[in-house]
């Protein structure tokens, strides 16, 4: 930030180290799941209709960030750009998208359409973040790019990614922003059970949501157990606007493959 004198002390350095760790962990997750199979995608050929809404929502987020990247770089607001990219890594990706999609990436068949689409989006995110972070994390992005690029070139010689305008979807953004609020409330209820030692991880829980008609319809097309990262989830209509969340320990046995608590574990699960 060139607009004021630089402030530095031990606490500030600790904060920056923690922020950098979050960014590195975001890249590490993508690299681990891509397993050296990074492939540049032709953004214009991406067929949004073939992707789940969650992936479409993340692509919308990339579109919004792309506009902000251009604006901040043109005005030399690198500190503002850094904060926005950090929040995207920590909140939208690590704590939300990656958390939900771990089960798909780790347990689904390598040939499943859902997993393939998830991997495509990881490729898109990785390529975009590498270029956007390049002016700020010069050496880190160069190191990562040298691992994934099949060409002997520098990340700093590449052009910026161009996000297609049709990835922007304000209606979908509003829907998933509201879904995110429901997830936050559910996470709080689950965390209380974890704190009291009634359950360990969230996958040991089953939840029952009592919600009004608006929120009920909002969750209609959502795999509730996958979205809330629990073993079982149900919803029922309520006349109250306030969400009521009942969290209990799931009944059954732990599946060694997906770690969910299933009443009957079989090879077909």
Region annotations inferred by a language model:
Residues 18-29, 56-64, 83-103:
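Core structural elements
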Residues 6-31, 83-86, 117-142:
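Structured ligand/cofactor/substrate-binding pocket environments in proteins
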Residues 1-49, 149-150, 198-201:
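Catalytic adenosine-cofactor/nucleotide-binding cores of aminoacyl-tRNA synthetases and other
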Residues 255:
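Short cysteine-rich clusters marking metal-coordination/redox-active sites
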């Amino acid at each position: 930030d060139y607009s004021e004198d630089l402030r530095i002390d031990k606490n500030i350095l600790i904060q920056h180290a923690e922020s950098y760790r979050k960014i590195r962990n975001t890249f590490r997750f993508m690299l681990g799941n891509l397993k050296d199979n990074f492939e540049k995608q032709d953004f214009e050929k991406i067929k949004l209709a073939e992707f789940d809404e969650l992936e479409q929502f993340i692509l919308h987020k990339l579109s919004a960030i792309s506009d902000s990247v251009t604006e901040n770089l043109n005005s030399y607001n690198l500190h503002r750009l850094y904060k926005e990219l950090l929040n995207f890594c920590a909140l939208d990706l690590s704590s939300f998208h990656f958390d939900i999609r771990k089960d798909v990436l780790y347990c689904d068949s390598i040939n499943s359409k859902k997993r393939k689409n998830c991997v495509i989006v990881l490729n898109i995110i990785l390529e975009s973040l590498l270029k956007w972070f390049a002016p700020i994390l010069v050496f880190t992005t160069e190191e990562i790019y040298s691992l994934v690029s099949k060409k002997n070139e520098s990340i700093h010689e590449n052009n910026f990614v161009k996000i297609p305008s049709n990835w922007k979807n304000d209606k979908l953004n509003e829907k998933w922003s509201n879904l995110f609020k429901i997830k936050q409330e559910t996470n709080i209820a689950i965390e209380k059970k974890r704190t009291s030692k009634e359950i360990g991880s969230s996958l040991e829980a089953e939840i029952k949501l009592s919600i009004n008609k608006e929120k009920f319809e909002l969750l209609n097309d959502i795999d509730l157990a996958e979205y809330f990262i629990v073993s079982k989830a149900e919803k029922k209509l309520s006349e109250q606007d306030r969400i009521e969340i009942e969290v209990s320990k799931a009944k059954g046995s732990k599946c060694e493959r997906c770690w969910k608590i299933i009443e009957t574990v079989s090879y077909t699960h």
